[in-house]
């Protein structure tokens, strides 16, 4: 259900089962499924913000009275069809902490994706990005140009079968469509990406149900608090990994990052999705 309260100052809320990776009195980290908006849109479709509000109200961590002066908010936005971890503040202190570590880049964000072709070596690529608001697409260049912003992306291949590569990406800057456009610019677009990808390559995977980019925000590291958060890949991602004989590379990387220590946390719902 979705309660929007049109024409009212009351906060909208919606209800669904959320995959909680981590939660304390101030912050919450949610494993967002592909297809869900991170933040409210103009058309009124419920987003993770409304689902979070509903979750906290139902749980009793938030009251209608508190909502008059504070509303929970997400601190990092994923594209609708990108899955993975989104951080949100449950309190003003939580929002301030998350905003600071995102701004200072003392929180490290890692993604996994499937890309066209064989990538053999790790790389640290830089460039400039400009968003065309009319088309909602970005342009990436190695040279600075008018109204462009600097971007930085690091990646390392986890495995490849020659046709497709399982890639880990560390997002240094967090611009709109950065990973998708930056990798496409290197000749290795994301599998399933209808905006920046290779349409002929994508067509080969439609029969498997791939209709969006296979990009998943799977790991967050906060050195300041010695915390490591992991959200294993969703079912469709794992299905393609298995089809392409990349399971071993995926599991080796996951086990390396999920050698859980005292302050480490991981998502529960997809923990065994690739088994």
Segments and roles (model prediction):
Residues 36-62, 97, 114-165, 181, ...:
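Glycine- and acidic-residue-rich catalytic/RNA-contacting loop of pseudouridine synthases
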Residues 63-103:
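Glycine/acidic-rich beta-strand-loop module
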Residues 1-45, 50, 122-128:
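Conserved beta/loop motifs at nucleotide-recognition and modification sites
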Residues 31-32, 87, 113, 155, ...:
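Residue-level signal for inorganic ion chemistry
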């Amino acid at each position: 259900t979705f309660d929007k309260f049109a024409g009212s100052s009351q906060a909208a809320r919606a209800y669904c089962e959320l995959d909680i990776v981590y939660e304390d009195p101030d912050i919450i980290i949610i494993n967002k499924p592909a297809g869900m908006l991170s933040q409210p849109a103009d058309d009124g479709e419920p987003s993770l913000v409304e689902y979070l509000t509903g979750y906290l109200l139902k749980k009793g961590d938030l009251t209608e009275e508190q909502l008059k002066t504070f509303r929970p908010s997400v601190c990092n936005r994923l594209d609708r069809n990108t899955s993975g971890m989104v951080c949100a503040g449950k309190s003003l202190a939580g929002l301030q902490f998350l905003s600071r570590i995102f701004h200072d880049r003392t929180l490290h964000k890692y993604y996994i994706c499937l890309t066209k072709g064989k990538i053999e070596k790790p790389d640290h690529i830089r460039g400039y990005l400009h968003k065309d608001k009319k088309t909602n697409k970005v342009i990436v260049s190695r040279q600075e140009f008018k109204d462009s912003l600097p971007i930085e992306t690091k990646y390392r291949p986890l495995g490849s079968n020659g046709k497709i590569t399982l890639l880990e990406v560390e997002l240094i800057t967090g611009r709109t469509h950065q990973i998708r456009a930056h990798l496409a610019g290197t000749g290795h677009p994301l599998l399933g990406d209808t905006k920046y990808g290779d349409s002929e390559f994508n067509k080969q995977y439609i029969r498997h149900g791939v209709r969006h980019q296979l990009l998943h925000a799977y790991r967050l590291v906060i050195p300041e608090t010695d915390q490591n958060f992991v959200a294993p890949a969703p079912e469709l991602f794992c299905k393609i990994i298995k089809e392409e004989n990349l399971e071993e590379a995926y599991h080796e990387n996951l086990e390396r990052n999920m050698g859980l220590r005292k302050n480490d946390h991981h998502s529960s719902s997809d923990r065994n999705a690739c088994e």
